[in-house]
Amino acid sequence: AACEGALLIVDAAQTAGSQPIDVQALGIDVLCFTGHKALLGPQGTGGLYVRPGLFIQPLVVGGSGVHSFDEQHPAQMPTALEAGTLNVPGLAGLCAGVEWILAQGVETLCAKETALAALFYKNIRDLPNVKIYGDPEMALHAPIISLNIGDEDSARIADILWEDYSICVRAGAHCAPLMHKALGTVEQ
């Protein structure tokens, strides 16, 4: 991207906290992530890494709470991108999640999640009516398995997996209604 004068912007919503990410080695200019997934923070948290020296013009600005009498929003990073009051309790929760992950080791957690996903896949791939989307055996694959079982409601499947097998999964649209429309899984 840099050779062509383009920025490399990475959406790490599914990987931050569960996969090692070296922004410098990968040449990432901007990395956005959610806090409530693998980083174990509360909902409503997340972050944006911006390469040092790169300035992003904010779309929305608000009071910074730091320079309350200034007529212009602060231009220095990261304050320039913080519109309004920070979610301090949420950030404290996110910080606790990140500290726990770092204490365990991202690589250790990644290996454990990958092993659990592989075990789950091995035990469901040949069951009748199981439809798996994607190829969980690919080398470069996050430990995520997208599936349906017949025409069953995904929330019911999630409940059964939790109640009968202590397997925690997420059911629903996952903010991807167009994907569900393309796959024909809107009703599930």
Task: Enumerate the predicted regions with their spans.
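Pyridoxal 5′-phosphate
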Residues: 1-188
